[in-house]
Amino acid sequence: MQQSGVPGSRGCALCPLLGVLFFQGVYVIFSLEIKADAHVRGYVGENIKLRCTFKSSSSITDKLTIDWTYRPPSSSRTESIFHYQSFQYPTTAGTFRDRISWVGDVYKGDASISISNPTMKDNGTFSCAVKNPPDVHHNIPATELTVTERGFGTMLSSVALLSILVFIPSTVVVILLLVRMGRKSAGLKKRSKSGYKKSSIEVSDDTDQEGDDCMAKLCVRCAECVDSDYEETY
């Protein structure tokens, strides 16, 4: 009787361990990980992409669903703005009517959407929920959207970049022309000191030199104009 009782006691002792392993196994099998940007900044009138990606341990089927919700600032009320299940179902009511577009790909784990013609009234919290049965338990990440007007500083930086793109190539061309002029001038001085008599070909080169001088002066003048425009811009 004692020998028969030992195996039974061991079996009972293993029950809790097996139970823990079983539940851990279920957790791993049915895990669904979702990621989204915590903060997104956009500008009025410019399309904004809200990124959402997911990883599922199960194969993608037509049972997969995606839901995007919106919650205004300082409010507990949420509204559905997009639903996906084999097809796209953007909201047909509310402030986001006809402004939500699907830009994701479920087979690549992408559940992103885009907002067209955003305004500052769109500021708030957006949540992305994905279910891919049997993976239904997951986190629900939230994205804080901030929409603002493009400020003067942003516009100024664009103007500055454009000015640099125009100024630098012009400066390089002028420098190359000046170097070429300097080399030709040094060669002519050496020849004049040695009493070298110019041939008809060299006379033709001098004519070309005069043309190059005029071109160089014109380029220098253009560079000065660019410099003056650059200074007026800033």
From Swiss-Prot:
Signal peptide: 1-31
Keyword terms of this UniProt record: Cell adhesion, Disulfide bond, Glycoprotein, Immunoglobulin domain, Membrane, Signal, Transmembrane, Transmembrane helix
Ig-like V-type domain sequence ranges: 32-148
Cytoplasmic-facing ranges: 180-234
Alphabetized Gene3D superfamilies for the sequence: Immunoglobulins
Function: Mediates homophilic cell-cell adhesion.
Positions glycosylated per UniProt: N123
Name the UniProt record assigns to this protein: Myelin protein zero-like protein 3
GO terms under cellular component: plasma membrane
Keyword Disulfide bond listed: yes
Cellular localization per UniProt: Membrane
Keyword hit for Transmembrane: yes
Family the entry assigns: Belongs to the myelin P0 protein family.
Regions that span the bilayer: 159-179
Membrane-topology annotation of the record: Single-pass type I membrane protein
Stretches assigned to the Extracellular side: 32-158
